[in-house]
Curated annotation (Swiss-Prot):
Alphabetically ordered keywords of this record: Cell membrane, Cytoplasm, Membrane
Protein family membership: Belongs to the adaptor complexes small subunit family.
Disruption phenotype: Knockout cells grow at least as fast as a control axenic strain and differentiation also appears normal with fruiting bodies forming under appropriate stimuli. Uptake of FITC-dextran, an assay for fluid phase endocytosis, is unimpaired while uptake of FM1-43, a membrane marker, is slower than in the control.
Organism: Dictyostelium discoideum (Social amoeba)
Protein name: TSET complex member tstD
UniProt keyword annotation of Aminoacyl-tRNA synthetase present: no
Membrane topology: Peripheral membrane protein
Subunit record text: Component of the TSET complex, a heterohexamer composed of tstA, tstB, tstC, tstD, tstE and tstF, which may act in plasma membrane turnover. tstA, tstB, tstC and tstD are likely to be the core complex members with tstE and tstF acting as associated scaffold proteins.
Protein location: Cell membrane; Cytoplasm
Segments forming a coiled coil: none
UniProt record, GO biological process: intra-Golgi vesicle-mediated transport; intracellular protein transport; membrane reorganization involved in phagocytosis, engulfment; retrograde vesicle-mediated transport, Golgi to endoplasmic reticulum
Amino acid sequence: MINSLLITNNNGNIVFSKYYSNINDEKQSEYEKLLYQFTKDEWVNSKNEKHLVTEFSGYITVFTNVGDLMLFLCGSEEMDELALSDVFFPIIESLKDICKKKGVTEQNFIEQIPKFILYLDEIIQRGHLDQVQLESIQNYSSLKHDQPIKKDNV
């Protein structure tokens, strides 16, 4: 099962987080601090979207750099690093797709978070991989995202 997806800037500040397991805010914060401490020295080696792996607290975490952002995908023991890397590919492609006009920067990503969430919800459902084809993800997401909101008399 996929436990979480975290996206940080290059300073380690959380820009986006999505947890698929039920842990409280205190444990989330503790996990995020530990993750930063365990991986910060390796960030320089993750350039060009090279996937790196770390394991602590019984979780396997695959992380990589995309543009100005660091992405961390954490899974339980039943998922190995290869399975997590496979889940990473549609996430990275989706991130690049929504940021293609201005590039993958922190500011551009923040502006595009609503669309990214739609993409992510198509890729991962309740902690399990659902869609991997970018075309399918775009099609499902565009159906949800591009429909205008109509104001009717209530």
